[in-house]
Amino acid sequence: KENYSPKNLFSSTIGDELKIASQGRSDVYSIAPDAESAILSAGHAANGAFWMDNTNGKWATTTYYKGIPWYVDRYNNGPESLASRLETMVWTPTLPMEKYDAFPYVLDDLPFRYTFSEKFANCYPNLKTSPFINKEINRLALQFLEYGGFGTRSCPDMLSITYYAGNYRGTMSKEYTREIQDTYYQLDQDIEKLLDTIDKKVGLANTLVVFTGSGYYKSEESYPDGLMVNGGEFHPKRCLALLNMYLMAIYGQHTSWVQGYYNNQIYLNRKAIEDAKLDLTTLQNKAAEFIQEFSGVQLVTTGRSLLTGDWNEGTAKFRQGTHHLRRGDLIIELQPGWKVNLDNPKEKVKIIRNNAVITPLVFMGNGLKPQHTVSYTHLTLPTNSLV
């Protein structure tokens, strides 16, 4: 069943802009551990996007993009495929254990050892959170550089690569600290190998390398008893039930006025509101005033206010970080330290923190002089496309 495509991506990407500028003559591909990253990096007009399949470890794509390069298909089914090498892959420390000293709160000096086998559940998802995923991405990227003709045409080509530098198995940052240090150490070597290959095949003088990162932060964290000095638990299900009762008391009990909750956003029943010929702005405002009184709620912003321009510097992040066709009717910001408890045993409790994620953006290429600039950037796509 086809599950992935960029059709729900509302913005243009750098790859899209390159396709437009070259009138379709440039090749644009992306490689990433997961489908979302691959498709977001590729865009609508790309030639292809590839990610590692969680069931067999092969490089997968979507039928939205037409055709698979022959060398990708050969790699997937040949002697170099991941499945043919999996049993020999063992992750152990690359350096002596005393070299992993970046985190002072590490509690032990025990070495680690992880193996990967299709006999075990989550084999490939686990591998995708180890340094091996970056090496596999490099191996496929080298196929593109060797056989894809990158840099040999009159128009520039683009190969977008997403590496993984998070915690093993998605655990908390305080766990597997030796592992994440080893991941960074090996990633540095992987990037070096990629740049050396580009230099040999195309020449770094003929290449623009754009390096950036999204930052890494896991909101799930546990505190020893008695050390959490502020905060509490916010239960979205209880909040929705009380909000629906409140709106029923005002507008009638013949329907449910609340549709659902997702990612700190509440969605109202738009069809019921339209059928009842109610004013959406008024209803959103009443709901926001009600939610604002909940313990732990710092701010409630209505989707209508963001759409009509009735927003300020404090709520600008909601407007810039959401699309009006997907945005909830109410966007909730909790106070720092409060936990979001979805009342689902399968979901971890999320602790709300205000984190400033510093995002590096490095340009390297012929004619670019070394310099360091710190700036608050609103739009990066036009700048990258221009460069």
Stretches with model-predicted labels:
Residues 1-155, 164-171, 292-299, 341:
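His/Asp/Glu-rich, glycine-adjacent segments
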Residues 46, 158, 171-190, 197:
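Extended hydrophobic/aromatic segments used for targeting, binding, or gating
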Residues 2-5, 126-129, 180-181, 273-276, ...:
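Second-shell loop/turn segments in exported
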Residues 326, 334-369:
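C-terminal, low-complexity/hydrophilic appendages and adjacent surface loops
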Residues 28-32, 158-162, 209-211, 331-333, ...:
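Structural recognition of the beta-strand scaffold that forms the well-ordered cores
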Residues 24-27, 154-158, 204-208, 326-328:
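Loop/turn elements at helix/coil->beta-strand transitions in domains of secreted/extracellular proteins
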Residues 1-2, 42-44, 68-83, 95, ...:
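Secreted, luminal/periplasmic, and some membrane-associated catalytic domains
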Residues 377-383:
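Conserved small/polar residues in nucleotide/adenosyl-binding loops
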